[in-house]
Amino acid sequence: MLVVLLLIGMAAHSSLIVIAACILLILKLTNVNFIFSLLERRGLEMGLTFLLLSILVPLASGKASWQEIISSLASFSGLLAVAGGALATSLNTRGLNLLKADPEIVFGLLLGSILGIVFLHGIPVGPLMAAGITALLMQLARIFKP
């Protein structure tokens, strides 16, 4: 399966899939399987931490001043960003609840993420948001079910 993912990543020119597949292949071939459980338990948290670090670098480096931040938040797009952030966290909560209730759904999320990377040139940011959107779509399907 990992070789298939590697080939898909190479065909799609997706460095993210290629790197992830290579790392997992190396871990598997070197028989350090304990890292799999660590990645399974804490990988999402570690990935989100690095994502947050990259977003906060302008604050830490001084490239963004408090005046610029306040000005940005007071703008229309800044207010929409606050609303978007609040909505995203709400969807993430729904996603977490869905993953807890139906853990097997992660395979569909994985396939959907791969298809999104390959065909839509998307960037996977994590299963929580994908699960949150799935939970929302499931709720809408129940509402509009004939």
Swiss-Prot record:
Pfam hit, one: DUF441
Family named by the database record: Belongs to the UPF0756 family.
Topology relative to the membrane: Multi-pass membrane protein
Protein name: UPF0756 membrane protein PTH_1817
Keywords: Cell membrane, Membrane, Transmembrane, Transmembrane helix
Gene Ontology annotations for the cellular component aspect, listed alphabetically: plasma membrane
Presence of keyword Transmembrane: yes
Disulfide bond annotation, renumbered to this chain: none
Taxonomy, superkingdom: Bacteria
Sequence intervals crossing the membrane: 6-26, 46-66, 69-89, 105-125
Compartments where found: Cell membrane
Lineage: Bacteria, Bacillati, Bacillota, Clostridia, Eubacteriales
